[in-house]
């Protein structure tokens, strides 16, 4: 590993762990309401689950395929990355354990207390024993593992009680699945929030289940399985419906190899070795956890505890003040472009556009790409209504949206039954773009309404994620959007564009070309600037171009919420680059690209991060902002985020992140944007 690579590049996986550490920091922040802190701890845990299932799983796959292959930024092999990951995760888990303990101690002031059999009253113990006997034990399905009994299949992320039993013939293990049929929390006292987790109850009374054996020791275990399924390998039978292929792959995922074993207590070394042998788990894949193995039970407290101090204040998405309720959306979009900023503004105006299109006699067709949808989607309702109204409706459903495959398979069938034409993306590329095209014919004239978004067509996430949606009647944009859909309908890729940036053929190269233009301006002594607000930065081609720009004096300001493989502020290399990360109440999800300064500034919104998977391995779309009012609004938003000194962290030259601290008035950019949306909506309501 060269000294330069150490200084200016960070490993993708380790950088992501730094992001998750920032999530955990929110769980440790006293200013965050107590139950919201619990939520952040839960998000930290679920983030790690997915990280192991996908990223760690893929590294194990890479070790099997080519153990000597090195990552292209820090030159680490898969084995070296895994070793570093396991070490760092164990450190972070220790912090999470401490955080959970502090949160639960604070919740005692509100009557909440997690029980174990060291702190229950005699009356509570009697209730728990009877509860186990009558409500739990009859539903248990105990298993014995030894030489005569095959090792059972352990479900991904399920909790099991593992009981080491005395045996004269070798190691014998009892397994008790903690079924989803059980209520997770047991409350042994009426009108009290003192509770015991059902898995702790089962573990305590396990000797009653294995009453013919002597229990030597016992623990709770939870495994995480590799979920990095390969779609391309499954496409060997071209006659199979793609939905059938994906359904088979989803089943296959549930049975992939374990990559992590979590245990709640120490287990006899012989018993633990036996478990690891059966699970094909090495010692460094074992994680000793002092907190509950699944923290999702905490969400129930939000319904139980209504004290305002425990929750964020309610923020209701507002109707955009730029939208007039007394005119159709199409009429307003034809007059000027409209931008919605979620979750501060309501997605309802976009949904209204779709329903209006169903009633518009001039609408000929509607085309849309779908990636992740809400469980009860009004957007699907609108598309069905459009088809029932006789419009030509083309829907590209991305069946490979990870962990949403089953949901999308179901929606694709629903749309097809309604009369929509349903297509899928190219075999080797996910379609991640957020693109809608409404085509109207007014007399002899063809009109387009195009919408490009940074986030999914999902009503639920539109209240939780920060995203942008721009709707325009620009004919040139509409024509190019139509070209995108035509190419996808034919199973082809867009080879070139003039206005839209469309991956995989014309996004990365156009971005680097625009950075080159700023480099040339800097060489001429003219103002030069590159900015980006993205979720992740790992595309080495773009990273190296940004480093080149920094070396030539271009000012580069990046807002990167998650992983960032570029290290900023390194003398002589990246000292003209700053990296800010905002982790707050809402998940930062919008993408904004900026090239140039002042009147020469060009801006885009996009579904694509600066990651190789987005820039050259997916179909993505970036929309140029041609409306000057929206361009100014976007720039103002970007500047506000750079000034955030409440939820922003800044990256240091050693790759670490510290909270931004200054003597200025506290500015939480997310709260600022909500208050701005509320103020504008209130003024509109008064007119």
Place the predicted regions along the sequence by residue.
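Hydrophobic alpha/beta core scaffold segments
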Residues: 555-559
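Glycine/threonine-rich ATP-lid/beta-loop region of ATP-binding domains
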Residues: 540-543, 547
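N-terminal localization/anchoring segments of enzymes in phospholipid and broader phosphate metabolism
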Residues: 1-530, 548, 552, 564-687
